Design a protein with these regions (language model features):
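A structured phosphate/pyrophosphate-recognition subdomain
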Residues: 1-67, 77-78
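Glycine-rich, acidic loop segments that terminate in or are immediately followed by a histidine
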Residues: 70-166
Length: 166
């Protein structure tokens, strides 16, 4: 839970993130946070719970999209909070046989995290040809940003490349 805590307190408006990090520098023990033993620990735990609540709602919604398909695609719109990597990683651990695609629409673009237990970077590279977008990363964990008007074409090409086994 501490790992999730540290990821999540870095999310949100920058003034809230700065306040959380400043408060974190005054923490002497993780139990101050986990057991809310001090005012600083209570503040940080409350902020974490607020962010985690948003995340858990998205995670629950993403799990509703699980089908027999090899690909688990989840799309959400969130202007302030980006959970694409966190969702992709957790869903990959829960559904290791799936190709996970988490996409967040923001500013006319689809910001994506892609995960699989096998190499998908080549499929991503090929799917981006002729598309207004960019992407890359590790062999089985990639990120991409695709213009919304090209999203459907990109998605079709990426799924075809996955089937082909690139």
């Amino acid at each position: 839970i501490l790992m999730k805590f540290f990821f999540f307190i870095q999310k949100g408006p920058s003034h809230e993130v700065h306040k959380s990090i400043k408060t974190l520098t005054r923490i002497k023990s993780p139990y101050e946070i986990l057991k809310q033993e001090t005012a600083q620990g209570k503040f940080l735990w409350k902020r974490f719970q607020h962010i985690n609540k948003r995340y858990e709602l998205l995670l629950k919604d993403a799990k509703k999209g699980v089908t027999r398909s090899k690909v688990l695609l989840y799309h959400y719109s969130e202007n302030q909070w980006s959970f694409t990597a966190n969702l992709a990683n957790e869903l990959m651990a829960t559904y290791p046989k799936k190709v996970i695609i988490i996409a967040r629409s923001k500013g006319g673009e689809m910001k994506c995290s892609l995960r699989a237990q096998f190499r998908i970077s080549d499929a991503l590279e090929k799917a981006l040809v002729g598309i207004e977008g960019r992407g890359g990363g590790h062999p089985n964990a990639c990120g991409a940003v695709i213009k919304e008007e090209d999203w459907a074409v990109f998605l079709q090409k990426f799924k075809e490349e996955i089937k082909r086994g690139t």
